Each structure stands twice: as C-alpha cells, then as structure tokens.
Regions:
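N-terminal module-boundary/linker segments of secreted carbohydrate-active enzymes
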Residues: 1-92, 248-260
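Domain-level detector of nuclease and nuclease-like folds
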Residues: 101-260
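Active-site-adjacent structural elements in enzyme catalytic domains
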Residues: 52-114, 118-123, 132-135, 141-145
Length: 260
C-alpha cells in the first residue's frame, strides 16, 4: 500500500515521493487478493456474467465515506504527483507552489475543488455516488464550473486554456487532458452504480460509450491512476477493475449499467 506522512495537520502533505509513489509489487498483491473470488468469471465468463460479478464485488467491498472524509483523502494523498504536489485532472498539471495546497491556504485561495466525473446532478447528489472516490478528482474551480454537468465527448466549441473545449449547444465537454482517466472512471461508475446514467440527453449514453472506449485504448493506464487505485482501496475498500485489468473494457457488457 502507499505510505504517506504529514508533519502537522495544517502543514503541506507530501506523499509517495520518488520510487515510493507507486509500489508495483505491493499493488499487484493487493489486486490479486481483491479479485480472487471472481477471477474464474473474469477469465471465462461472458459480458453479462463479468458485469454482474464485478458489480457484486465492487459493492460488497465499498465503504461509504462521508463527502467531507472523501475530499480530505482526495486532497491529502490520492490526487498527488510523485513530487507530492496536487494533480489537476483536466489540465494534467497542478499548483507550482506547495503552499497552495495546505488546508488553510486552500480555503483562503479557493482555487480548486472536487470534480465528479459523473456529475452530481445525474444521480441527484445521492450517496454513495457523491463520495465515491473512484470518480472524484481534484480540479481548478473555474474548469470544474466550465464543464458543468455536460457529457464528455470530442467536440468543437469554446477552447478554455489548460481545461478543455466546451460545446454549449450540445452540452458537451472535451477535456484537455485526463481522457483515459475519465473513461475508466465512467466505466467503473456504470458497473458499481447501475441505473443512474443515460436517461437524459445531457448524460452519457450507450452510443457515447464508444468514445470513452476509444479514449481508454488511446490513453493507457498511468502510474498516477495506479497510485490512486491502490490508495483508494486503503480508505474506501474497493478498486477500479479497468485500471487493474484494462482488457476488461472490451469484455464487459455495460448495458446493465445504463438507466432503462
């Protein structure tokens, strides 16, 4: 698991510096143990069988955190780069000055907050979806607001520096960075929380899933995501199977995840 430390609760937190940022062997052991009960289905089952097995596993191992607790973990340990600074999802960057990311300065500056890859309005701000760390990411307030509750897609529209492209006509948003991350976060959500996505025009539909699958293939899993995945298991209990086994994206039948 990921090791972290803080010198004081109001001091900047540095986590996983250098080679300790992502412990590959420890993560592999965690992964193998986590999926051991469904491994046979993952290898031999059909798309619906795999979906149902993963849905049961992700749900039974999920600890429902308060939103406050989830964000505390997100900012302090989960969304950190190898140098210990925060990572912004849609720009692929973060604060250059570590003073920006300590608790008091964050509240005073108000320059970043919590982005829900699956917007809160799609699931009426209900828990456990609201605090599910696998689709929560740190983002600049301005960029988070610009994305609003728009669907993720490749679009032409207003370009926002270090953020993305917004198409206000079709209610769509294309991030500047993080396309692989948002694809895998959305696929996780469809498996973990079925029935909340796809019943309104602004939401991801089965047709839109094709674009996410393309991003998933085009932008492979990074050590940042692996660090997130293992660290989230520490605090929330479950994992994102599309980070652990990227090939599952082509095997899972996601139809059961969409609202009817």
């Amino acid at each position: 698991m990921i090791h972290s430390y803080a010198t004081h609760r109001n001091a900047p937190v540095r986590v996983g510096i250098g080679e300790d940022y992502y412990a590959e062997e420890a993560d592999a052991a965690d992964r193998d143990e986590y999926y051991s009960s469904v491994q046979d289905v993952l290898e031999r089952g059909d798309g619906e069988d795999i979906y149902q097995s993963l849905n049961g596993l992700l749900g039974s191992t999920h600890r429902d955190l308060s939103y406050k607790t989830a964000r505390r973990h997100l900012y302090k340990t989960i969304d950190r780069r190898p140098d210990g600074a925060l990572y912004y999802l849609y720009s692929g960057e973060g604060p250059k000055n570590e003073e920006e990311v300590d608790g008091p300065n964050r509240r005073r500056l108000g320059n970043y907050n919590c982005e829900h890859v699956v917007p809160q309005s799609w699931f009426h701000k209900r828990r456990p979806m609201k605090s599910d760390l696998h689709h929560l990411f740190t983002e600049k307030v301005r960029c988070n607001s610009s994305r609003a509750n728009y669907n993720l897609a490749e679009v032409e529209g207003e370009s926002l520096p270090n953020c993305g492209i917004v198409d206000h006509k079709d209610d769509e948003f294309e991030p500047h960075a993080g396309k692989g991350e948002v694809a895998r976060a959305t696929m996780y959500f469809l498996v973990r929380h079925p029935g909340y996505v796809g019943d309104r025009r602004v939401e991801t539909s089965p047709e839109d899933l094709k674009q996410l699958l393309e991003w998933h293939e085009q932008y492979p899993v990074t050590d940042y995501e692996r660090h997130r995945n293992d660290t989230i298991q520490d605090v929330q209990g479950n994992r994102n199977p599309f980070i652990d086994y990227p090939e599952l994206a082509e095997k899972v039948d996601f139809q059961s995840g969409f609202a009817s």
